[in-house]
């Protein structure tokens, strides 16, 4: 499964949004309606899913789905 698809699954589950609402260009807060607590929970779920640690300083930079996918892709290399 591609990183985008795995991220999308986590986002759909954590934010209770429709799968077709999650696109690479979707902004987590603006487009998907997440609040700050949602973002924290989303980051924790992503850390668990991908078995990585995302420092708070990096998590703050994850604005869109593409930011998340690119960040996780970078960690997996």
Curated annotation (Swiss-Prot):
Alphabetical list of PANTHER family matching this protein: ACYL CARRIER PROTEIN, CARRIER DOMAIN-CONTAINING PROTEIN
Presence of keyword Iron-sulfur: no
DNA damage found in the keyword field: no
Modified residues annotated as O-(pantetheine 4'-phosphoryl)serine in this record: 36
Subcellular location: Cytoplasm
InterPro entries linked to this entry: ACP, ACP-like_sf, PP-bd_ACP, Ppantetheine_attach_site
Listed GO CC annotations: cytosol; membrane
HAMAP family: Acyl_carrier (MF_01217)
Domain of life where this protein originates: Bacteria
Organism field: Campylobacter fetus subsp. fetus (strain 82-40)
Signal peptide region: none
Name assigned to this protein: Acyl carrier protein
Physiological role: Carrier of the growing fatty acid chain in fatty acid biosynthesis.
PTM comment text: 4'-phosphopantetheine is transferred from CoA to a specific serine of apo-ACP by AcpS. This modification is essential for activity because fatty acids are bound in thioester linkage to the sulfhydryl of the prosthetic group.
